[in-house]
From Swiss-Prot:
Entry GO terms, CC: cytosol
Keywords: Cytoplasm, Exonuclease, Hydrolase, Nuclease, RNA-binding
Residue ranges occupied by any S1 motif domain in the UniProt entry: 561-643
Protein family according to the UniProt entry: Belongs to the RNR ribonuclease family. RNase II subfamily.
Organism placement in taxonomy: Bacteria, Pseudomonadati, Pseudomonadota, Gammaproteobacteria, Enterobacterales
Domain of life the protein comes from: Bacteria
Protein name, UniProt field: Exoribonuclease 2
Biological function: Involved in mRNA degradation. Hydrolyzes single-stranded polyribonucleotides processively in the 3' to 5' direction.
InterPro entries the record matches: CSD, NA-bd_OB-fold, RNase_B_OB_dom, RNase_II, RNase_II/R, RNase_II/R_CS, RNase_II/RNase_R, RNR_Ribonuclease
Record GO terms (molecular function): exoribonuclease II activity; RNA binding
Length: 644
């Protein structure tokens, strides 16, 4: 009788349209229930039966109901699933497979089967890549995934590397393309093999891509020649290898090993500026005035050089600081080091006055055993030899930025616009609260930004600096010239690492066009998109492998009295994120470890402070001693608490 009844259909439609709905992101918990975090900062309870239809991170719409005076939501439609492609561990029971995603809030195993073209015999504990195929909110009975790639066994010591690379869909090995033929075309090379060029790198570096030579002009000024390895002499634009390099965009440096952008034969041998080997280079010659200013005589040219010494950062630094056993092999090399040191001090002083100099932060290097175990973590402070190379490279990149801008009007530029205009008023308000007067329009100029940064660097603590950084925009890659506020420079275009950066290869080709007087095409914007995306993925991969190795390294320190000095890098709703200064690990201190009474404690991300009973106890940038409370290897989570 009620079948196909138009009145009933109309009533259903009215009820449907009157039912209130909310859109938001599902947040899972360990307890079976969940919450829907709506875009307006409000969250709604999702009871356990309804949580079975969704997954943590899903963006959904849900209907809103009231049950026992409490608002609850019932998931209705899926807008965007949290899981599409993911990595996880296999479970096998009675020949049926399921996979648990490698995510701290996804504990449920998802039924799965191997894709038709995947022939691996999956076993319990194996790691695999999977793609979601079914979802309850799409009308399916349950979740279901398809295994698209086998990664490795559960007990492989190199799990952190292989799983991370698979998670981010990054290559696991060097390109396998043979190329040894050189194509110089109309490029004429100057013979500079008699000059005392030197390379300065880490002792273990094989892909040396920059060599330096300095000459004293006798009037207080110096003439610097920067010679850069020339892979574009072997890699033609549009060739198979060029397309591979463009796709990879960068050499991927992970703890323990790297995955090169170019074949190792090129990166570590044919192009590498090895000592006493003749190599083709792209070079730049420029005068550095006594006060460190760059001359207007910038000259780019092609050349052949022969590096006379492969120097290591620590050896050069020790020698300049009059310590250690190491000595340069002869007086010519010693003179080069002295001149480079003089150049470094002049350029550093000029940049401190007229541009901006980054504060030195140490690097942390993992020392790994044969099976990927962490033997130690070494703190590598930036020393004078690192600064020599840094100042020379920055000078070289400013030269390229000027020449490409003036001759072509385009290139691959690193651009940073300082403050985000949308946040500038907030930045001014925060500065005002801390007694620093600033004008919004002035802060949006390069000079205004530099003046503020110098003022912040002179502050006794990092607190205000860390508050203000939240309002800055991100650095970008652009095909048109623009300022780099972070460096305090009018323009910046890198060309000094073409073995490991595709953008630098593009700039090499453009500089060669300037040298030979040939026409050059403006790079496509999709190149900059790929560079930005790959930089993001490579950084995430480095962080993920690091998190895994830190968890392994600190596992046996959990529950002991070993103290670590730590710096607060962030205040979150639930506690503090701190960096252990001895080894670089980022760990979490839950607020309950700081003060037991939740209502008396306020964690303010906005203010960067943690207060107890209204008194500020910790601020971002503060240091404190901590001990490791717990290490969860399966999620790579490290929990610490303040040392008593």
């Amino acid at each position: 009788m009620f079948q196909d009844n138009p009145l009933l259909a109309q009533l259903k439609q009215q009820l449907h349209s009157k039912t209130p709905r909310v859109e938001g992101v599902v947040k899972g918990t360990d307890k079976g229930f969940g919450f829907l975090e709506a875009d307006g900062q409000k969250s709604y309870f999702i009871p356990p039966p309804h949580m079975k239809k969704v997954m943590h991170g899903d963006r959904i719409t849900a209907t809103l109901h009231t049950e026992k005076d409490r608002e609850i939501v019932e998931p209705e439609t899926l807008i965007e699933p949290f899981l599409t492609r993911f990595v996880g561990r296999i479970h096998k029971k009675d020949d049926r497979l399921s996979i648990t995603p490698d995510h701290p809030l996804l504990k449920e195993a998802i039924p799965c089967r191997a894709a038709r073209d995947v022939t691996d015999d999956f076993q319990e504990g194996d790691w695999a890549v999977a793609e979601m195929r079914r979802h309850p909110l799409k009308g399916d009975r349950g979740f279901h995934a398809e295994l698209t790639q086998y990664i490795t066994t559960g007990d492989d010591p190199l799990v952190p590397w292989w799983v991370t690379l698979s998670r981010h869909n990054l290559e696991r090995s060097a390109p396998e393309v043979e190329t040894t033929e050189r194509h110089d075309g109309e490029l004429v090379r100057e013979d500079l093999t008699a000059l005392n060029f030197v390379t300065i790198d880490s002792a273990s570096t094989e892909d040396m891509d920059d060599a330096l030579y300095v000459q004293d002009n006798g009037d207080g000024s110096l003439q610097l020649t920067i010679a850069i390895a020339d892979p574009t002499a072997y890699v033609d634009a549009g060739s198979e290898l060029d397309n591979i390099a463009r796709q990879r965009a960068f050499t991927n440096y992970l703890p323990g090993f790297n995955i090169p952008m170019l074949p190792r034969a090129l990166s570590d041998d044919i192009c590498s500026l090895r000592p006493n080997e003749r190599r083709p280079v792209l070079a730049c010659r420029v005068t550095i005035a006594a006060d460190g200013a760059l001359g207007d005589d910038i000259h780019f040219f092609a050349a052949s050089i022969e590096s006379k010494a492969k120097l290591a950062y620590d050896n050069v630094s020790d020698w300049l600081e009059n310590q250690g056993e190491w000595q340069p092999q002869n007086e010519e090399i010693a003179e080069q080091i002295r001149l480079l040191h003089r150049l470094c001090l002049a350029r550093s002083e000029w940049r401190t006055t007229h541009a901006l100099v980054f504060k030195d932060r140490p690097d942390y290097r993992f020392l790994l055993g044969e099976k990927g175990e962490v033997l130690d973590i070494v703190v590598e402070h930036r020393r004078i030899a690192n600064r020599i190379v840094e100042e020379s490279m920055i000078a070289a990149n400013v030269c390229a930025a000027i020449v490409l801008r003036d001759k072509l009007g385009f290139g691959i530029y690193n651009v940073h616009n300082g403050f985000d205009p949308a946040s500038i008023e907030q930045a001014v308000a925060v500065l005002d609260t801390h007694g620093v007067q600033a004008d919004a329009q002035t802060l949006l100029t390069l000079d205004g930004f530099c003046t503020l940064r110098r003022e912040l660097d002179a502050q006794p603590t990092q607190f205000l600096d860390s508050r203000i950084r939240r309002f800055q925009s991100f650095a970008e890659v652009s095909t048109t010239p623009g300022p780099h506020f972070g460096l305090g420079l009018e323009a910046y275009a890198t060309w000094t690492s073409p073995i490991r950066k595709y953008g630098d290869m593009v700039n090499h080709r453009l500089l060669k066009a300037v040298i030979t007087g040939q026409a050059a095409e403006k790079p496509q914007d999709d190149v900059t998109v790929q560079l930005a995306e790959r930089r993001r993925l490579n950084r995430m991969a480095e962080r993920d492998v690091g998190d895994w190795l830190y968890a392994r390294y600190l596992k046996d320190k959990a529950g002991t009295d070993i103290r670590f000095n730590a710096e607060i890098i962030d205040v979150t709703r639930g506690g503090l994120r701190v960096r252990l200064l001895d080894n670089g690990a980022v760990v979490f201190i839950p607020s309950s470890f700081i003060h037991a009474v939740r209502d008396e404690l306020v964690c303010s991300q906005e203010m960067g402070t943690l207060s107890v009973k209204g008194e500020v106890v910790y601020r971002q940038g503060d240091t404190l001693d901590v001990i490791i409370a717990e290490v969860r290897l399966e999620t790579r989570g490290i929990v610490a608490k303040p040392a008593a």
